Amino acid sequence: MVPITLLKLVENNSFLSVLSSLYHSNGFELYLVGGAVRDGILDIPTEDFDFTTNATPEESIKLLKTNNYKTTEVGRNFGTIELYDQKNVVHITTFRKDTYKTDSRNPEIENATDLITDLSRRDFTINSIAYSIAVSYTHLTLPTSV
């Protein structure tokens, strides 16, 4: 079940629904993750939104530019683009899987094909919770290993 405070966050930021519908109507998944989910649950206002998607950065850039949005690649190695609207900064990152060598804190990154793999790489706090705005107002997604 989605907390009413998270639903309120989405309702107060119609841009999130528009963005989510744009991705879904073009065959892509898009999930709100990270601090925005936390802030929505805790009823804290935010204008910083992170999403994860199965669209590659190139697919996201093409989709967004076709619909007159301005984008910047901010983390090529991490599959992240930044999107601006009039009041929000949005980061959209392709699903990914991180692996670590025993002697390094820097991850080796590869694209993942599903949400659960992406969530499983995140720390096991609120950052591993995802919310699909376009698909369901009824539940949050957690990695199965939590």
Where are these regions (language model features)?
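Catalytic cores of the polymerase beta-like nucleotidyltransferase superfamily
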Residues: 1-140, 146
